[in-house]
Amino acid sequence: MVRFITDHRDEYGVEPICAVLPIAPSTYHRHRAGQIDPARRSARAQRDDVLRVEIQRVYDAHHQVYGPRTVWKQLRREGIRAARCPVGRVMRGRGVAGVVRGRAWITTTHAADGGRPADLVDRQFVATRPNQLWVADFTYVATWSGFVYVAFVIDVFAHRIVGWRVSASMRTDFVLDALEQAIYARSGTGLTGLVHHSDRGTQYLSMRYSDRLADAGIAPSVGSQGDAFDNALAESVMALFMTEVIRRRGPWRSLEAVEFATLEWVDWFNMRRLLGPIGDVPPAEFEAQYYQQAAVA
């Protein structure tokens, strides 16, 4: 509006234009003076100018998925003092918003009831140390060349993704590869007392998968098929993945494109993404704090 008045003031004058627009001449002159000499702008406007640059930097650095609360938390971590309300106001003024999480799709084909492991978790997705409880799940992604499937194994303690795999097939090999990656990544920290929890998917109840858990000394736990609450933490991470990567950056051309995006996102998620349930720190940092405290205990 200020620009419109400036563009037409020589022809019509400021006051006549303001008379038909919802703006007072004094407001226009104040804004115009601030444009000509930024030092004459209000203290709040000058603070917003500085904050606007920092908000955009954080927003871009974190894949443009953070909302006002998480942007504010990241600014505080970096030592930039700002109240939460101004962060939200500046973001709204720029039309910048975080992504809205959707739900993950149910992909489970359940196995027969006979002989499945007991539910050792009972919807209590808490752990007091790393390698105490893992949860596993997978979802599907539509690409131009057909569906591909993405599996995760997540350590509940810090919500860290310890294994993942992208495949064109839903066969057992696919989720078994994600498990193998998790076992390899965590083998140096000990797997004693570890519980692996999943839904009743045929892949997770297969003989090969069960044997691999047994070989590694991992106790299996299985919830009820089709009930998201029985694998709520895995569903939560999967929903983040679908919202922050798949739905936002699609459509997808190929398995390779999904695989590269997943690799990039998992690294960012583990190393940099702030997670509210663990105190607004990244999973890797939360784990590092645990090991530091354990070393001096």
Language-model segment annotations:
Residues 1-297:
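Charged DNA-binding/catalytic regions of mobile-element recombinases
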